[in-house]
Amino acid sequence: MGKTLFDKLWNRHVIYGKEGEPQLLYVDLHLIHEVTSPQAFEGLRMENRPLRRPDKTFATMDHNVPTEDIFNIQDLVAKKQIEALQTNCAEFGVTLADMGSDRQGIVHMVGPETGLTQPGKVIVCGDSHTATHGAFGAIGFGIGSSEVEHVFATQTIWQQKPKSMGIEIKGKLPKGVYAKDIILHLIATYGVAFGTGYAVEYYGETIQNMSMEERMTICNMAIEGGAKMGMMAPDETTFEYVRGREYAPTDMEKAISDWKTLQTDPDAEYDLHIEMDASTLEPYVTWGTNPEMGVPFSRAFPEIKDMNYERAYEYMGLKPGQKAEQIELGYVFIGSCTNARLSDLEEAARIVKGNKVKNNIRALVVPGSRQVRNAAESIGLDKIFIAAGFEWREPGCSMCLGMNPDQVPDGVHCASTSNRNFEGRQGKGARTHLVSPAMAAAAAINGHFIDIRKEAVISGGN
């Protein structure tokens, strides 16, 4: 019987262990940031251990970075974590994309941009959205601080092999519908736990026709569907993305020859298989307090079916039967490792251009990396957003999570391009609605959610 992409990747990296039991995997790339690494570095120091492979470790600042003024860190804990990463990287010989450097940004954007993220690798990071890197035909998953220390010391990690799931996505995306809507649809349809215990491969004509940036959006939120990791087979789109980047292979053609073997064999079988027709999708909006609580734009919010729904409606200040356009928005956030890439900002700017943010909205655009910010400014996107009334910020995780100054006030609804809408995720009492960058941009200039498939409803002015 043939092998799946996941099987091939996993088998390449097993050092020790029997099938059905935890196995020791070799780690090709360890990405770190300021929040989950301090304890791990301290563990090495206490045991007088070296960091085994500094050359396979790469650090950046993202979670705690103030995006209004990156060097003005008021929070003492955040400042201490950032200073600790600087000290630790210098002591242990780890390359650091430091504050203000041309490579600094959200860790899951910096990896691909620098060419560190490549097909065939096992990539780990002390962050749950490491699944993003699976878009390149890699294994990527998040680990805890104790596991970060284990990788520091050994360049390996113990893991139980997940089962395999194949999600075949067919059809052309309708106008106004994006990769973000695909993953929101899957989670709303099958739930936040449907991927538990699985490594998910997304494939099919819809995926093949996507850019790498779109593919990363889908893999980024595999974890929100419960999966251990998400991945896609590498192809010419992947190879061209990696080619010429700072850490791309020296012998690119040799690498591509190997990467082309990283495909699921025709006679391979997944443990679970799902099919999806993307041609019938609508823009999605979440109404509740987990990504499963989402609906197509045309559909009303569902009836209360259990205590979780009842609590979600109470927290969000919404009722069954309402529709997305009735939500009284106060904030719009375009950013995060899900949707802060150049193509995301270009699509948002296309909608924003020539319009103005409504008076009831505070709108932020936070590029996910310095590279994206520089590229956006080189084509004038910053001017479009600023002219419309958006705040144009420095790169960082920003309003995706309440760990830095960018937070949504208590009780305020926010249209957000991030990946999680949990209670308090964007700040105490914040009410988060997950959408695509286009939906968020249109909401900013209309003051509420609109059906972006109907261009006539995009209006300017206050």
From Swiss-Prot:
HAMAP family: LeuC_type1 (MF_01026). Keywords: 4Fe-4S, Amino-acid biosynthesis, Branched-chain amino acid biosynthesis, Iron, Iron-sulfur, Leucine biosynthesis, Lyase, Metal-binding. SUPFAM superfamilies: Aconitase iron-sulfur domain. It catalyses: (2R,3S)-3-isopropylmalate = (2S)-2-isopropylmalate. Its EC number is 4.2.1.33. Its cofactor is [4Fe-4S] cluster. It comes from the Bacteria. [4Fe-4S] cluster binds at residues 337, 397, 400. The keyword Iron applies. Pathway: Amino-acid biosynthesis; L-leucine biosynthesis; L-leucine from 3-methyl-2-oxobutanoate: step 2/4. GO terms for biological process: L-leucine biosynthetic process. Pfam families: Aconitase (PF00330). NCBIfam families: leuC, PRK05478.1, PRK12466.1. Heterodimer of LeuC and LeuD. It is an enzyme of class 4 (lyase). It comes from Listeria welshimeri serovar 6b (strain ATCC 35897 / DSM 20650 / CCUG 15529 / CIP 8149 / NCTC 11857 / SLCC 5334 / V8). One of its GO terms (molecular function) is 4 iron, 4 sulfur cluster binding. Binds 1 [4Fe-4S] cluster per subunit. Belongs to the aconitase/IPM isomerase family. LeuC type 1 subfamily. Catalyzes the isomerization between 2-isopropylmalate and 3-isopropylmalate, via the formation of 2-isopropylmaleate. The keyword Repressor does not apply. This is 3-isopropylmalate dehydratase large subunit.
